[in-house]
Amino acid sequence: MADLSSLKDLGTATEAAAPAHVRKVDSLGRSYATGKRKNAVARVWVKPGSGKIIVNGKEFAEYFARPVLQMILRQPIVAAARDGQFDIVATVAGGGLSGQAGAVRHGLSKALTYFEPGLRSVLKKGGFLTRDSRVVERKKYGKAKARRSFQFSKR
């Protein structure tokens, strides 16, 4: 490592060492990422196209029937102002529909940043690149649920 004699040298050395975000695209011109939420794991491929979104072989509006879930899935595209510019194919397994929608959203956000590194700051600011680590708390013995105690009778 270079001789660091001042704070200015330290600043330039750390800037040079910081990894630049590089575009990650496969031979077919697609970016791939995995997203997770609760117990759901989504594998997402993004490529330039007309704006089709396919989840587990179905149109996303058919797979996620509730409008709230559709909105959750489309949030990164809308935030990045790239509506109708990418074709998205996702396979998702595990968990329920809400967790699956969140997993696809997380994977889609990561895939968009791999395809177009300039979108990273916008998606990071929206909180789409952060893995939501909240999972169901385990049930404890001596309790009815995770925290709820059994009914107590004083007399």
Swiss-Prot record:
Signal peptide: none
Keywords: Ribonucleoprotein, Ribosomal protein
Gene Ontology BP annotations: translation
Transmembrane segments: none
One GO cellular component, as annotated: cytosolic small ribosomal subunit
InterPro entries: Ribosomal_Su5_D2-typ_SF, Ribosomal_uS9, Ribosomal_uS9_bac/plastid, Ribosomal_uS9_CS, Ribsml_uS5_D2-typ_fold_subgr
Gene Ontology molecular-function annotations: RNA binding; structural constituent of ribosome
NCBIfam families in alphabetical order: PRK00132.1 (NF001099)
Family: Belongs to the universal ribosomal protein uS9 family.
Protein name: Small ribosomal subunit protein uS9
Species per Swiss-Prot/TrEMBL record: Rhizobium leguminosarum bv. trifolii (strain WSM2304)
Lineage of the species this protein comes from: Bacteria, Pseudomonadati, Pseudomonadota, Alphaproteobacteria, Hyphomicrobiales
